[in-house]
Swiss-Prot record:
It is a peripheral membrane protein. Residues 902-912 have a biased composition (Basic residues). Its main location: membrane. ATP binds at Q87, G105, E106, G107, K108, T109, D508. InterPro entries: Helicase_ATP-bd, Helicase_C-like, P-loop_NTPase, SEC_C_motif, SecA, SecA_CS, SecA_DEAD, SecA_motor_DEAD. It comes from Xanthomonas axonopodis pv. citri (strain 306). Monomer and homodimer. Part of the essential Sec protein translocation apparatus which comprises SecA, SecYEG and auxiliary proteins SecDF-YajC and YidC. Its EC number is 7.4.2.8. This is Protein translocase subunit SecA.
Amino acid sequence: MINSLLTRVFGSRNERQLRQLNRLVTQINALEPTIEKLSDAELQAKTPEFKQRLAAGESLDKILPEAFAVCREASRRVLGMRHYDVQLIGGMVLHLGKIAEMRTGEGKTLVATLPVYLNALQGEGVHVVTVNDYLARRDAAQMGKLYNWLGLSVGVVYPGMPHSDKREAYGADITYGTNNEFGFDYLRDNMALSRADRYQRNLHYAIVDEVDSILIDEARTPLIISGPADESPELYIRVNRIVPQLTRQESEEGEGDFWIDEKGKQVHLSEAGMGHAEELLLQAGILENAEDGLYAAQNLSVVHHLNAALRAHAIYQRDVDYIVRDGEVVIVDEFTGRTLSGRRWSDGLHQAVEAKEGVPVQRENQTLASITFQNLFRMYKKLSGMTGTADTEAYEFQSIYGLEVVVIPTNRPTVRKDHPDQVFLNRKGKFNAVLADIEDCAKRGQPVLVGTTSIETSEMLSEHLRKAGVKHEVLNAKQHEREATIVANAGQPGAVTIATNMAGRGTDIVLGGSLESEYHALGEDATEDARFKIKTDWQRRHDAVKAAGGLHIIGTERHESRRIDNQLRGRAGRQGDPGSSRFYLSLEDNLMRIFASDWVQKAMRMMGMKEDDVIEDRLVSRQIEKAQRKVEAHNFDIRKNLLDFDDVNNDQRKVIYAQRDELLDAESVKDNVDGIRGDVIYDLVARFVPPNSVDEQWDLKGLEATLESELGMSLSLTDMVRAQEEIDAEQIAAKVQTAVDAHFAEKEAAIGADTMRALEKHVMLTVLDQGWKEHLAKMDYLRQGIYLRGYAQKQPKQEYKKEAFELFSEMLENVKREVINLLARVRIRSEEEVAELEEQERLQAQARLMASQFQHQDVGGYGADEEVEQMQGGNAPVPVSQVTRDEPKVGRNDPCPCGSGKKYKHCHGQLS
């Protein structure tokens, strides 16, 4: 009550911030008459002047009013667009490192030019992050004219571009690209073997377009660079033949072999199902021994494959979750409706879906490097974002990214009519009403955009409209190439456009059709008469559509997030245009079926509702919103859980990447090697001759053998001890250290100091990378099963932190030991041979990187759903998948493949 009283007196925090920023708008507007009088050359000279002022110690905030006024005037001259006052406010919010919520059609792309220009003056690089390559290239081309005119360089990064071009793009003052490309380039940079192979500078300032899509929707899944593992995909194909013979039960207590947890997207075998599955697997020869049982340790791999196959058949649907194109399974993004080419689900799910669809099954992958979007974007010194829908997720932006959401008022009042939801008993009644609404709009000449949640639904609606003779366009992942054309015409009188969520971002739907597209089709040589005729025809269509009520939005289903629903509604009513929206729902929709209260369905059936009966009731609408809040909270828990786990990885990642940077930058790593050598030799001697011990406890023969096998040194310690009457453990350690130092000095004298320095650097980088790769595999394995500790009354996150630290410490010790072992056993080569080998290794590393897979991994691989489920009382563990190897399997007691002569378990097997 007190809060509401204070808000009425002083205004909300959002209103207070807008009032403060309006004072700066007044200053900018006061400068406009002076700036307008400047010639082009004088206006362009402002950029070097600002740079000089910044170099002299002035702050960005001090020059902001004048810089914004210059950018506004330059935009008017170059682009023919002048920033509105509300756009100036949006630009200030972005400069302050906050999120600007701006409605569709308010010109977010133009708003970004203000803070981009201001912050690019520092010369440290500005990254403008978009959701797809098309928007990155489009915005770089359009806004690049303005930046170039003002004397700033612009680059755009995209997959597959030449190395030199990408380095140049990152060296520009302003760089456009997608969130995925910026993330993968960061990981690639931290796999490079020389500074010349790196792309990015320091992460200085980023503006994220459609910030909710990137930092929330896509934050559930990490970016991963992976290489193929050696395990054959044959088992996926064999298990796939068995799954159709298992029967689904309606609930956990029903009859059948398995039941589905739709909230967690998991499949669980019943007790009877386990027996039936064992029987089928034995018949197929996949299980070898009936007495061991399905969950015996040696059969965990089979359980992993069976679980993946069950999920592929029971949960993941073709033309909903994925499409099959050119013999490949391509994921469809559940939030945007776009295809995610090149991305693969983890935990064997993608292979299981490939087996289900009868396309070639690709091998599973081993992680080489990974990072989440949360930790990637939190590394920028300053981060900001813009979107049409952020306020519903303001708490998450603040708690995870430290970003405040500021709602920017529209330039003109919004007049869109949002009609109440209509709820039907079943899907048939709902779609009958949708079709009737579409036909009514088409007859009246009102354009209509129909939003669907899947490709399957969009094609079903399309078929019904085709039979009814209603002309329409379909925009989904299968027709993504025609997206720009379809969206450009979606505002034509009577146009009917059926679209998945992909139509929601990036391009405005203009009433009467896109005038710019028509001008572009005319060509640059078109006469003024031709352009006038085009403009006249467009104005007539524009007025006709406004008279018919503007763009009408039809939602065929509520999304899991209210924000996605608001995005769809926001397609209508841009810049004060008329428009309307309505959602049609049924009790059979996924959201209602899975998350809404049972009493809603029972009450409607008790009231005797029939197929075509409709309910418009606030109570039902509140229940729907309550269901959406449940899903949003569940998804937030998953993202927060993922971040908690990745924060552990991130601390380790920072240490490793900082060490790599130090190695790459160093002219010489001799001091590092000398320090490591001292530690390694001390630990080695202490294993056989413990400090402060007596000679009866010493194992001199073992120490001699280890020095011979690991360091290639022949040292007779037994004879040395016999020759001295008084000698202790510390003296032995000192003598071994002296001998090893002399051994290294001999190597250096033989091959030359410069060659030795280059070799030390190369070995340290290579061993560190190999150790980190193997450590990531262990961390994956640990993470996938850690939530099971909850059943032993232990806190999974604390257990994960503790064991991750132990693994990391072990990895660092192994890296130290391996560096010294390799350098001690180095063969003497000429400088020319060493240079040639280094170049070969660099080229091989680049080739491996080119062959790597770049994934935006499914969240299942992080155990997030499982732990959230476990914390909420779930009790069905998901089998842990096995870590795959890059090399053929070596037995613990076999000779180590490195050629040391030791058993594998005493040599490189310590890392496995």
